[in-house]
Amino acid sequence: MTRPQAILTDIEGTTSSISFVKDVLFPYARRAMPAYVREHGNHPQVRHWLNQVADEIGEDVPDDVLITTLQTWIDEDRKHTALKALQGLIWGDGYKIADFTAHMYADAALQLQAWHAAGIPLYVYSSGSVPAQKLFFAHSDAGDLSGLVSDWFDTEVGSKREAASYRRIAERIGVPASEILFLSDVIEELDAAKRTGMRTALLERREDYPTPRSADDVGSHQRVENFSQLVF
C-alpha cells in the first residue's frame, strides 16, 4: 500500500473494542439518563437535543417519555444524532469523575502516534458525537491522544453507510478521496467510502470478530487484524 495523504478512522471495533462501548459506555448512559435529563433538562443545549427526540417521535410529550424513548434507542443501538449528543454529555461527566477511561487498542495508539509523527493527518469519523469522540481520545487508557487528530466527523456530516458522507469529508479536509485511507470494522461503511474512490482497510480484530467474515463479503477491501499490519 502506498502512503496516503490522510487517514480517516472509525472508533468502535477499529481503534477500540466493541465490548467497551456495548458493555461500559452504553449501560452507563442508560442508567444516568433519567437523572441527567431531570437535572439538566432546562439547559438550552440539552433541551435542544430533547426537542429533536420529541420531533422524531412526533408528539408533544413529557420528559419521562423522552427518557424512556432514549433508553429504548440505547438498547437498539440507534444512530440518532440527538441520542449520540446526549450520551456524549453524560459520558463527559463520567470521564471527569474517572468512572472509566476509554479503551484503546495498544497497536492503534502506537500506530496513530507514529503516523502523526510521520506527518500524515489523522481524522475520526464515528456515529458518536464529535464532543464524545474528543472525550474518548482525551481520556483513553493510553493517555490523551486527542492532539493527534486534525478534525472530527459524526452523523451531522451524514450516514456512515452513504457515499455522499465521505465525499463531504474529503471536501472538508481538502484531500482527494483517492488519497484518503478509511479504516473501519463495518463492511457497509467501507463499501460506501470505496464508492467515492477512497482506499479502505477492514479491521477484523479477533477480540471483536472471532469468526472471520467471508471473502465474498469483504470483497476488495484490505483485511487486517490490527493497525501494525497497515504498512506504507
Swiss-Prot record:
Requisite cofactors: Mg(2+)
Pathway where it operates: Amino-acid biosynthesis; L-methionine biosynthesis via salvage pathway; L-methionine from S-methyl-5-thio-alpha-D-ribose 1-phosphate: step 3/6; Amino-acid biosynthesis; L-methionine biosynthesis via salvage pathway; L-methionine from S-methyl-5-thio-alpha-D-ribose 1-phosphate: step 4/6
Listed SUPFAM superfamilies: HAD-like (SSF56784)
EC number: 3.1.3.77
GO process annotations (BP): L-methionine salvage from methylthioadenosine
Function: Bifunctional enzyme that catalyzes the enolization of 2,3-diketo-5-methylthiopentyl-1-phosphate (DK-MTP-1-P) into the intermediate 2-hydroxy-3-keto-5-methylthiopentenyl-1-phosphate (HK-MTPenyl-1-P), which is then dephosphorylated to form the acireductone 1,2-dihydroxy-3-keto-5-methylthiopentene (DHK-MTPene).
Family note: Belongs to the HAD-like hydrolase superfamily. MasA/MtnC family.
Entry protein name: Enolase-phosphatase E1
Organism: Xanthomonas oryzae pv. oryzae (strain MAFF 311018)
